[in-house]
From Swiss-Prot:
Keywords attached to this entry: ATP synthesis, ATP-binding, Cell inner membrane, Cell membrane, CF(1), Hydrogen ion transport, Ion transport, Membrane, Nucleotide-binding, Translocase, Transport
Origin species: Blochmanniella floridana
Subcellular location per the Swiss-Prot or TrEMBL entry: Cell inner membrane
Catalytic activity: ATP + H2O + 4 H(+)(in) = ADP + phosphate + 5 H(+)(out)
Main location as per UniProt: membrane
Name this protein carries in UniProt: ATP synthase subunit beta
Alphabetical list of InterPro entries matching this protein: AAA+_ATPase, ATP-synt_VA_C, ATP_synth_F1_bsu, ATPase_a/bsu_AS, ATPase_alpha/beta_chains, ATPase_F1/V1/A1_a/bsu_N, ATPase_F1/V1/A1_a/bsu_N_sf, ATPase_F1/V1/A1_a/bsu_nucl-bd
Record flagged with keyword Nucleotidyltransferase: no
Bilayer topology term: Peripheral membrane protein
Lineage: superkingdom: Bacteria
Gene: atpD
Family label: Belongs to the ATPase alpha/beta chains family.
Length: 464
């Protein structure tokens, strides 16, 4: 057994000295027993640097309270390993795979290391099958494919977590798929609400939850995304189509910044770590679909100060197949989900993938909304009367389209007072086509607000 001694503690970074011929490898896990009189704690460290002179620098995967120089450290001779397989479904784990839901141990047959290689090029799948979410604005304007990577961009409080909760609910119930949810540096309250929402929806047994909340050390928040991804990779390799939800990628970046500063690395632009692109690439390249199964990833990405040019969101952009931008201006109008259809984009919005009709209707919706944006200044200064008849019609239809893009969510029923709605792709396309064609020009625009299909809008108009 390889034993070392702690020689320095700087916050979450610990230096350990070993015998010169027994130095741990990078990413090896080390174990420290901390005895504080009444309590006993086992702390796991991960080797991230070899400093020379038989000293390794580690990051702590837990609180360093009670650590002191001279404590013995055991080299476990392997990386951090977490339980994988169906035994993880319905359970809440921390970064080390330990259960934190007070339901007893996870009796998993297998444990996998959280540091793994991305699949080889010949193993990758090029399948282009659409994944229907039941959310109109997403299915029409920025469709997903199985095995795609989707980014939910938005500032504070515009609905990233609620959108993720609705996606998990819809896909678990309508598609009967497995999901892995990773909470990276988010609020404990949100994690608790999310857990109880999964119980309320009856889909907890189809979701594995991995939490590294914002009160935890940076090491936990940096590695928890890899823990969740490892669990998802196991499901994929067993032939399942699995969904991986990460909330929030920005906190993953921020944890990397904290660790980088503690390790003494020179910072890059805006204070981010100089290895930002590499760390992001190592995570994103593992989120891949193979010929065995698929991992479809939905990642919430906080945008600092609503600035999309910040290095953190821009580094993430390069890896995504679809970007869904949540707008504060649209949220201010009371339209939820607050997706901006003009800023959002999907590589899958292609006639070869979605079909010509879907492609044409999505483009028509975009052009009508874009024209409405251009006319807003004229309306504000001169009023509607100065517009041509054609422009008046565009404004009328665009306001209906804008409201029809809203939708009541199942997970938000208690807040909105509207019953949740899942809308098929066929109903979505048909509804927008009929609005564009002017079939519902006689209906009040308010009848299209917070409804599912266009049939619900017709029924609503009868009571307005």
């Amino acid at each position: 057994m390889s034993i070392g001694k702690i020689i320095q503690v700087i916050g979450a970074v610990i230096d350990v000295e070993f015998q010169y011929n027994d130095i741990p490898n990078l990413y090896h896990a080390l174990e420290v027993n901390i005895d504080n009189g009444n309590s006993h704690q086992v702390l796991i460290l991960e080797v991230v640097q070899q400093l020379g002179r038989s000293i390794v620098r580690c990051i702590a995967m837990g609180s360093t309270n009670g650590l002191k120089r001279g404590l013995d450290v055991t080299n476990l001779k392997h990386g951090i390993q977490v339980p994988v397989g169906k035994e993880t479904l319905g359970r809440v784990m921390d970064v080390l795979g330990n259960p934190i839901d007070m339901k007893g141990p996870i009796n998993s047959i297998e444990k996998w290391s959280i540091h793994r290689s991305a699949p080889l090029y010949e193993e990758l799948s090029s399948n282009q099958e659409l994944l229907i979410t039941g959310i109109k604005v997403i299915d029409l304007m920025c469709p997903f494919i199985k095995g795609g990577k989707i980014g939910l961009f938005g500032g504070a409080g515009v609905g990233k977590t609620v959108n993720i909760m609705e996606l998990i609910r819809n896909i678990a119930i309508e598609h009967a798929g497995y999901s892995v949810f990773v909470g990276v540096g988010e609020r404990i309250r949100e994690g608790n609400d999310f857990y109880h929402e999964m119980i309320h929806s009856g889909i907890l047994d189809k979701v594995a939850l991995v939490y590294g909340q914002m009160n935890e050390p940076p090491g936990n928040r940096l590695r928890v995304a890899l823990t969740g991804l490892t669990i998802a990779e196991k499901f994929r390799d067993e032939g399942h189509d699995v969904l991986l939800f990460i909330d929030n990628i920005y906190r993953y970046t921020l944890a990397g910044t904290e660790v980088s500063a503690l390790l003494g690395r020179v910072p890059s632009a805006v204070g981010y770590q100089s290895t930002l692109s590499e760390e992001m690439g190592m995570l994103q390249e593992r989120i891949a679909s193979t010929k065995s199964g698929s991992i479809t990833s939905v990642q919430a990405i906080y945008v600092p100060a609503d600035d999309l040019t910040d290095p953190s969101p821009t580094t993430t952009f390069a890896h995504l197949d679809a970007t869904i931008v949540l707008s504060r201006q649209i949220a201010a109008l009371g339209i939820y989900p607050a997706v901006d259809p003009l800023d959002s984009y999907s590589k899958q919005l292609d006639p070869c993938i979605v079909g010509q009709e879907h492609y044409d209707i999505a483009n028509n919706v975009k052009s009508i909304l874009q024209r409405y944006q251009e006319l807003k200044d004229i309306i504000a200064i001169l009023g509607m009367d100065e517009l041509s008849e054609e422009d008046k019609l565009i404004v009328l239809r665009s306001r209906k389209i804008q409201r029809f893009l809203s939708q009541p969510f199942f997970v938000a029923e208690v807040f909105t007072g509207f019953s949740g709605s899942y809308v098929s792709l066929e109903d979505t396309i048909a509804g927008f086509k009929e609005i564009i064609d002017g079939k519902y020009d006689h209906l009040p625009e308010q009848s299209f607000y917070m409804v599912g299909s266009v049939k619900e809008a017709i029924e609503k108009s009868k009571i307005l």
